[in-house]
Regions:
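Bacterial N-terminal signal peptides
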Residues: 7-17
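Catalytic domains of carbohydrate-active enzymes, especially glycoside hydrolases
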Residues: 56-82, 158-163
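Positively charged n-region of N-terminal signal peptides that target proteins for export
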Residues: 1-6
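Active-site-proximal loop/short-helix segments
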Residues: 82-90, 130-132, 141, 158-177
Length: 177
């Protein structure tokens, strides 16, 4: 088994070293991204802020991301069947507003505008099934699929995001392994 693992690693290294010979194209398509999790919103100065404070702090975040050589940001817009934007499908995220009520401005609209002003692509990062630490939406349910599709449509019809990113399929479990 070790022999096969070594051969596989050697083969992958060889393939990666060959490249495609078109460095200009490869460089222009390279993605250097960072994920901004809802669990970091408070520390980053995005939670329970006025619009001006939110905008100033988001601007600093994007300036830092760009200064560190990144060109893409994956921003957590839906973590627990909630939304960081006004939604007809989901409640407002407690990670932006402690009371779960809209703050009187549209955080995602601001984020998209500021990201693009820093020449960053911004992807809406969603956890499609997670409702809480112990509850998930039923992945086999047509109602769940319709709910997720409606949330994606809501985002792509209202915001100039550069992509939708589904991630972190957390399922309740009692087994840590």
């Amino acid at each position: 088994m070790k022999h096969y693992s070594f051969l596989l690693i050697l083969f992958m290294a060889l393939c990666l070293s060959l490249g495609n010979g078109n460095k200009a194209q490869a460089g222009s398509l390279q993605t250097k991204g960072v994920w901004v999790s809802c669990f970091e919103f408070e520390e980053l100065g995005l939670k329970d802020k006025t619009e001006a404070q939110f905008r100033a702090n988001a601007n600093k975040i994007f300036a830092t991301i760009r200064a560190n050589g990144c060109n893409t940001v994956y921003f957590h817009v839906r973590a627990y069947d909630d939304a960081i934007y006004p939604s007809s499908v989901a409640g407002f995220s407690k990670y932006i507003s402690s009371d779960g009520k809209a703050p009187g401005y549209d955080p995602l609209k601001i984020l998209v505008s500021l990201a693009h002003s820093h020449k960053l692509k911004i992807h809406a990062w969603m956890n499609p099934y997670r409702v809480s630490s112990t509850k998930i939406l039923d992945p086999a349910s047509e109602m769940t699929t319709a709910r997720i599709v409606n949330q994606v449509k809501e985002i792509i019809n209202r915001y100039a995001v550069d992509g939708i990113h589904f991630d972190d399929y957390f399922y309740p479990t009692v087994d840590e392994g």
